[in-house]
Amino acid sequence: MSVFALGMILFAYLCGSLSSAILVCRLFKLPDPRHHGSGNPGATNVLRIGGRGVAATVLVFDVLKGMLPVWLAYHLGATPFYLGLTAIAACLGHIYPVFFHFKGGKGVATALGAIAPIGWDLTGLMTGTWLLTVLLSGYSSLGAIVSALIAPFYVWWFKPQFTFPVAMLSCLILLRHHDNIQRLWRGQETRVWKKKDRRKGPGKT
């Protein structure tokens, strides 16, 4: 491994280790997301704690910290293999941040950001898959799980040279959602939004 590749991987990990959820919550004087809500320092939990505006800020920074190192490595001529390692390093930084005792989030937004430099068509498909799943089910975690499962197939169709590293990213995301999968199976997962029951009349509650 070259010094350049090693440097990019380390830079990606350090970028990922900057926990947007924790830092933004501190900035807005909100509770630590690691100790409130679901306990996960990610945009969905911040949505529960601080509302849409703060959650959107966290989401943007989580995406950017995956996108920046991969975009930089891409434009500096890194091979697909090392681009994949750079993307994985950014997500590992988010999940196991060195600056926050190695206790981080689940890496979904950071993974999306890391995939973005590969192609905006892929990014659009991934985002659309997540949004459609969440709109139909109400579960943010299910959106992440479905997107992670289908991402390698999207990449194989559009940019096959990146299939293996994206498959590794997907495995990482699915492993981090192990508890969510169990709660979904038991019907105990918390929805981010609920459909209104149209069967209820105006006088029913």
Swiss-Prot record:
It is found in: Cell inner membrane. SMART domains: G3P_acyltransf (SM01207). It is a multi-pass membrane protein. The keyword Cell inner membrane applies. Its main location: membrane. The keyword NAD does not apply. Belongs to the PlsY family. NCBIfam families: glycerol-3-phosphate 1-O-acyltransferase PlsY. Keywords: Cell inner membrane, Cell membrane, Lipid biosynthesis, Lipid metabolism, Membrane, Phospholipid biosynthesis, Phospholipid metabolism, Transferase, Transmembrane, Transmembrane helix. Signal peptide: none annotated. It comes from the Bacteria. One of its GO terms (cellular component) is plasma membrane. GO terms for molecular function: acyl-phosphate glycerol-3-phosphate acyltransferase activity. The chain crosses the membrane at residues 3-23, 53-73, 80-100, 112-132, 138-158. This is Glycerol-3-phosphate acyltransferase.
